[in-house]
């Protein structure tokens, strides 16, 4: 009788172990199927949902409206401080190089802010209009200055980082990125065009200048680079890591394929009607009138649009820039 009971218990234990092993294998298979389905979903998409920080100018956590308003006010104040810092560098540069002071110009985009619980990240792009040796020397000094700003040592208690930290009670990290080409950022390209003489933008010399700014495309090299990047992602298995921006950085927004510039306004007080000029090149030239993609209510995944309004002594004008990347 005892032997029969022991056999039954052993059989029950074996059955339980078999059931547990079967459930474990089923769970593993389900997890693998879910990960594969998610990967295929992202692969068939335009990859925009993978990059959570593709385009942002302000990221903050909000728990009440007063905190949001205070942060917006602090952001405007820090914008002015950063602009003054860049102006001081350029004024110092112009005093040391009087002959080229009319040619030196720093174009800076609006800084981007990322608020965290105990930290604030500030990032902005800038472009130097004149790349002579004197300007490069002083921009290297600016790099050293920015490293000083990010240093938390007690020796630099009076630096700008600590001064700005006193207003918001957070550690501040400032990251400045120099652009070698004006078309790398839509805001900087728009400001660059606004500094030019508007009356000469429709001339052939200006068109040649804009065409020379754009890189020469080689379709075979672009295709081979994309294929190599995709093969590298497969070999390194980065495609399973959806939390990072590796796929977006490797496959998108690497090559400028076209640009469009829209000029509209009255540059003479005696004019009764507004003039309108459209300059385009590259991939935007063929699709301008066929699909009418220039309207702001249709912004594709690889199109970046920015416009700027200005009033001067000759009248009012608007510049709208559209850049297309792949």
From Swiss-Prot:
Keyword Mitochondrion among record annotations: yes
Chief site of localization: mitochondrion
GO biological process: translation
GO cellular component: mitochondrion; ribonucleoprotein complex; ribosome
Location of this chain's protein in the cell: Mitochondrion
Record keywords, A-Z: Mitochondrion, Ribonucleoprotein, Ribosomal protein
Pfam family, one: VAR1
A Gene Ontology molecular function term of the record: structural constituent of ribosome
Domain of life, per lineage: Eukaryota
Role noted for this protein: Essential for mitochondrial protein synthesis and required for the maturation of small ribosomal subunits.
Protein family (similarity comment): Belongs to the universal ribosomal protein uS3 family.
Name of the featured protein: Small ribosomal subunit protein uS3m
Protein species of origin: Naumovozyma castellii (Yeast)
Gene assigned in the entry: VAR1
């Amino acid at each position: 009788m005892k032997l029969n009971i022991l056999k039954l218990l052993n059989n029950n234990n074996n059955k339980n172990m078999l059931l547990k092993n079967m459930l474990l294998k089923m769970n593993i298979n389900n997890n693998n199927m879910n990960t594969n389905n998610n990967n295929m979903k992202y692969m068939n998409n335009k990859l925009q949902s993978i990059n959570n920080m593709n385009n942002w100018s302000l990221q903050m956590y909000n728990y009440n409206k007063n905190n949001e308003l205070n942060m917006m006010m602090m952001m405007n104040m820090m914008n002015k401080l950063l602009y003054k810092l860049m102006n001081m560098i350029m004024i110092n540069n112009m005093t040391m190089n009087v002959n080229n002071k009319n040619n030196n110009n720093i174009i800076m985009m609006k800084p981007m802010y990322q608020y965290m619980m105990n930290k604030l990240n500030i990032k902005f792009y800038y472009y130097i209009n004149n790349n002579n040796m004197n300007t490069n020397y002083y921009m290297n000094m600016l790099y050293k200055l920015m490293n000083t700003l990010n240093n938390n040592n007690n020796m630099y208690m009076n630096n700008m980082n600590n001064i700005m930290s006193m207003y918001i009670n957070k550690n501040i990290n400032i990251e400045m990125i120099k652009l070698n080409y004006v078309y790398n950022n839509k805001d900087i390209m728009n400001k660059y065009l606004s500094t030019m003489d508007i009356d000469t933008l429709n001339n052939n010399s200006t068109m040649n200048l804009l065409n020379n700014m754009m890189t020469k495309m080689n379709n075979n090299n672009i295709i081979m680079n994309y294929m190599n990047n995709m093969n590298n992602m497969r070999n390194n298995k980065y495609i399973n890591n959806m939390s990072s921006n590796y796929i977006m950085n490797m496959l998108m927004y690497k090559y400028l394929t076209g640009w469009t510039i829209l000029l509209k306004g009255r540059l003479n007080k005696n004019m009764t009607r507004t003039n309108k000029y459209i300059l385009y090149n590259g991939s935007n030239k063929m699709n301008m009138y066929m699909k009418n993609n220039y309207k702001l209510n249709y912004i594709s995944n690889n199109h970046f649009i920015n416009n700027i309004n200005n009033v001067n002594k000759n009248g009012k004008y608007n510049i709208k820039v559209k850049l297309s990347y792949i």
